[in-house]
Design a protein with these regions (language model features):
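Acidic, Mg2+-coordinating phosphoryl-transfer loop and its flanking beta/alpha structural elements
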Residues: 25-29, 68-108
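Substrate-recognition "cap/lid" segment bordering the active-site pocket of phosphatases
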Residues: 29-68
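Short beta-strand/loop segments at the ligand-binding rim of alpha/beta enzyme cores
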Residues: 16-20, 62-69, 86-87
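Short, acidic loop-to-helix structural element flanking the phosphoryl-transfer center
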Residues: 1-20
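Short acidic-hydrophobic, aromatic-tinged amphipathic segments that line or gate anion-handling sites
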Residues: 44-50, 107-115
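Hydrophobic/aromatic ligand-binding patch that stacks against planar heteroaromatic rings
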Residues: 13, 35, 61, 80-81, ...
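Short, charged, surface-exposed secondary-structure boundary motifs
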Residues: 53-59, 98-106, 119-121
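Cytosolic catalytic headpiece of P-type ATPases
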Residues: 3-6, 29-33, 97-98
């Protein structure tokens, strides 16, 4: 995947608010570990080569531990996780055509990743 330009600052702001960041991606584990390092995200919270069902499992496990979960994603492969999160956010920053079906499955649609900062959940 592509790293959005504002993601580093966005992650820092969220972390400063005490929000724990988890990454679940279909990308290679090595790439996700590197991303976690760049973003200063705990590597134990970074999961690579994750299927759509796997993303859903991550969301469910976090909720089972008492976390309130905001799922941010950008594609149809995120729908299962969106459906299980407390708040689902679709980012359309990737500039690909987005399915109306996908838009209808989310609580929020954002143009820039930094917009998650203003979502109260």
């Amino acid at each position: 995947g592509k790293l959005f330009s504002e993601v580093t600052d966005t992650i820092k702001i969220l972390q400063s608010r005490g929000i724990e960041i988890y990454i679940a991606s279909g990308d290679r584990k090595g790439a996700i570990n590197k991303l976690a390092e760049i973003l200063n995200v705990n590597k134990k919270h970074a999961f690579g080569t994750v299927s759509p069902k796997g993303k859903c499992k991550v969301v469910r496990c976090l909720k089972d531990r008492g976390y309130k979960v905001m799922m941010v994603g950008d594609g149809l492969n995120d729908v299962l996780a969106f459906n299980n999160a407390d708040v689902s956010v679709l980012t359309v920053e990737q500039e690909e055509e987005v399915s109306p079906k996908l838009i209808n499955k989310t609580d929020y649609v954002i143009q820039k990743i930094s917009e998650v900062i203003s979502i109260d959940f």
